[in-house]
Amino acid sequence: MWNAAMTRQGLRACLVPWGRGCLLALLVALGASVAAPDLDKTQALALQRYGSRAAETVVAWRRLIEESRALPDADKLDKVNTFFNRRILFESDAVIWQQEDYWATPLEFIGRGAGDCEDFSIAKYVTLLMLGIGNDRLRLIYVRARIGSTTTVAHMVLGFYPQPTDEPLILDNLISSVRPASMRSDLAPVFSFNSAGLWVGGGTSSLADPTTRLSRWRDVLDRMRQEGLSP
């Protein structure tokens, strides 16, 4: 499933339930790492905008980053997945932002103390970049998640690839443990992306250059820079 290529026509068909603008919302530029983040600024903004509880969470986030830099990759994945899954609540954009689809920065996500699957995935992605994991080993993956026997819903997870053609390990806000994709038969990959490109299904060949498009993702990056996280 995770290595099966899909056609461009199939991609368009799968995207219809998620909204016409969602593909553009994914294709933007992101640097290969988060360079020299100013987490002092991020922490100050958390206190100013959201209060002491948010600032305390940023302090804990910074501690996680500092203490995890030298760990093996598997431990980094587990600690980052656990940190956000335990500290942040899942809630819809309609409730949090009064919008149908809003992609939050890590600061906004921490500040509100809640977010949806995109927000969890983005925060984990950014954190793992800061921990030194290469962008070529990370992809945000849009999937159809099966609920029950027949119903599927749009969902996003983060995938870690030990090697570009390997089976990914999946970080999911709905699952406490990091599991290989082969153990997530409830997820059907539609496409995945990072700064280097866009992949359809579980394919290994990029179909697009994300640096050529504008999107919500670009807006997230702009807001991240203003908040002390410089891509």
Describe these PLM feature segments:
Residues 1-15:
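N-terminal secretory signal peptides that target proteins for export/translocation
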Residues 2, 33-231:
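A structural boundary/capping signal
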Residues 18-31:
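Bacterial N-terminal signal peptides
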